[in-house]
Amino acid sequence: MSKIIEVTKDEFKQEVLERDLPVLVDFYTDGCGPCEAMVPVLDALSERLDGKIQIIKHKVTMEDVLEGQSWIVKEYDVLSFPTLMIFKDGEMLKQNFGALYEEELLKFLDVVL
């Protein structure tokens, strides 16, 4: 099973933008009900799509949003949670704001599957 990786803003470039596999990034924050609802969905998807896509989680704090402390938040306009983005070859291809069920998420990923 592909392991879901948690990355910091310092690891984002290497783990997301420079990865060979397509990457699904889940931008989340603490205390977010819809973010918590995505955990079992992402776990199931990680197992289902093993070797086809890498799932990465990136925690965003309120300081990142309100005080501009994260280049990622600025670059990709992450302002609501969860925000899901698909990256391939260092380029963001698609984004979604809000939680998705597994089948909806598979449709969202059609651009790289």
Predicted regions and their residues:
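Thioredoxin-like thiol-disulfide oxidoreductase module
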Residues: E11, D43-L113
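Short, proline-centered helix/strand-breaking motifs
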Residues: P22-L24, P40, P82
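Conserved redox-active cysteine motifs that mediate thiol-disulfide chemistry
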Residues: F27-V41
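Conserved SAM-binding loop
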Residues: L24, P34, M62
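Short pre-active-site segment immediately N-terminal to redox-active cysteine/selenocysteine motifs
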Residues: D20, Y28-G31, S80
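N-terminal leader/targeting and pre-domain segments
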Residues: M1-V23, E104, F108-L113
